[in-house]
Amino acid sequence: MIWHVQNENFILDSTRIFMKAFHLLLFHGSFIFPECILIFGLILLLMIDSTSDQKDIPWLYFISSTSLVMSITALLFRWREEPMISFSGNFQTNNFNEIFQFLILLCSTLCIPLSVEYIECTEMAITEFLLFVLTATLGGMFLCGANDLITIFVAPESFSLCSYLLSGYTKRDVRSNEATTKYLLMGGASSSILVHGFSWLYGSSGGEIELQEIVNGLINTQMYNSPGISIALISITVGIGFKLSPAPSHQWTPDVYEGSPTPVVAFLSVTSKVAASASATRIFDIPFYFSSNEWHLLLEILAILSMILGNLIAITQTSMKRMLAYSSIGQIGYVIIGIIVGDSNDGYASMITYMLFYISMNLGTFARIVSFGLRTGTDNIRDYAGLYTKDPFLALSSALCLLSLGGLPPLAGFFGKLHLFWCGWQAGLYFLVSIGLLTSVVSIYYYLKIIKLLMTGRNQEITPHVRNYRRSLLRSNNSIELSMIVCVIASTIPGISMNPIIAIAQDTLF
């Protein structure tokens, strides 16, 4: 009898919870419509995989890509709407958040065609790979719109868990297992430190979890200049630093880049930084409004260390993926300049513009690594010597993306860096911008060294890998070439396109 009553109570409680969740989704679902499209795509993938055979594999790619494109379309239709807070203050919708969501969706959309031939050649499980990519994308999108401490913690954990699984996707590869172990351990440690910082914010504000309410709580409790806020600032900086991977939080980056499947590295190298940058701008700018001098100093130190260490160590690398890992550490130092400048002097606009160009430059370079690696089985820099003689399109595309990463005119990377450094200079960050300029010159050296190898035509310098290079392993490699063409075009946009891009980015401020 007692068990029967308890069972009825459990059913009633479950029904109430379900009805409350349904009520929230019904009245607030329009605010997360792009995310709902991805959720529907995930469900559809699972249904097709459980009821289909190998002949339906192209449908899996089609559904994944279509759901991403539809989500981008939904975001564009919602552009310029009034900022709204939904789900009882957990989620905020505004142009600033949406442009970061757009960047994450763009990364995922380009990474899926980048992965098709790699998955077929390595015989990886397709459905799970696509599920993890879409779920990580979903976590990144929720992180961009997160408006309270709980969502800011749960959303990146969703992204991180999928990242751990993707990085160890090739289970038989010892390097992949090692990379995943390091990634998982350091990710768990950084998450615990992040939660520790959140607990100090929660306690100091009198039990508030929404970002703006935390500010009001700190004013009411007079704790905005307390030692607890300093502890919270340091802890949260360390936690977010793991996602951004600036020095000295970069130890996991080279190993994960080298050991993980190349399409996974391409995906993680851009999406994690976009999502973490969106979260960092809101966390530092709102709850730590009264500690702006302190977090500016912290980020300046991280930016300087990242730009110097990342670019100097990249010179010594022999693996293409490890070189790009250290290059990305230097690149995040440039992005941090935009975070420090903030609203004033178009700091966020310059950061968003540079990140858009960085996505195209980085993914274009990784498309070349995927294509070359599938045909030669190597990512050693020396093995690229003479590639121009066998595949001029691949060599020229690689050269353009690398030159744009280095910031040479008239490519997109040059104008992106120029605008970013100019905003930093106007904000009085003279030393930081000077370091950025010097390290950019250093980066040009190792990019040009690779381009020289690509373009060499002397027989004695052409490696056996290039001599035995085959144009295509499969019937067609159009999917990789499609991503590469899009990225190369975006990486070589002349300066005439900068003004409309910056104008759009300026509309995304809070």
UniProtKB/Swiss-Prot annotation:
Name this protein carries in UniProt: NAD(P)H-quinone oxidoreductase subunit 2 A, chloroplastic
Domain of life: Eukaryota
Family indicated by similarity: Belongs to the complex I subunit 2 family.
Catalysed reactions, as listed in the record: a plastoquinone + NADH + (n+1) H(+)(in) = a plastoquinol + NAD(+) + n H(+)(out); a plastoquinone + NADPH + (n+1) H(+)(in) = a plastoquinol + NADP(+) + n H(+)(out)
GO molecular function, one term: quinone binding
Transmembrane helix among keywords: yes
HAMAP family: NDH1_NuoN_1 (MF_00445)
Membrane topology label: Multi-pass membrane protein
Gene it is expressed from: ndhB1
GO CC entries: chloroplast thylakoid membrane
Function: NDH shuttles electrons from NAD(P)H:plastoquinone, via FMN and iron-sulfur (Fe-S) centers, to quinones in the photosynthetic chain and possibly in a chloroplast respiratory chain. The immediate electron acceptor for the enzyme in this species is believed to be plastoquinone. Couples the redox reaction to proton translocation, and thus conserves the redox energy in a proton gradient.
